[in-house]
């Protein structure tokens, strides 16, 4: 992360406080959930409505990401990274399992034909 961004995240927490930023995180997560819902409802709408929903989803994602980066300052970066690695490894194992199941299903379907 660029040093100037780290400075902004730290200053936000220092100026507004941990409790305020935790409240802001819940607000931003709620807005992201709404944006996801609106985006999913836009699938069968006009291109313009889809684009607006997409842009709003990107904006709300950025807001949550900025709050997460503030939480990295509030909490412990190393602990967050440790859990992140564990979760990614678990996700990778699930992906591999799903891929293997698809391969097996396809080979069984091919044999039955």
Indicate residue ranges for each PLM-predicted region.
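Flexible "arm" and connector segments at domain edges
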Residues: 1-113
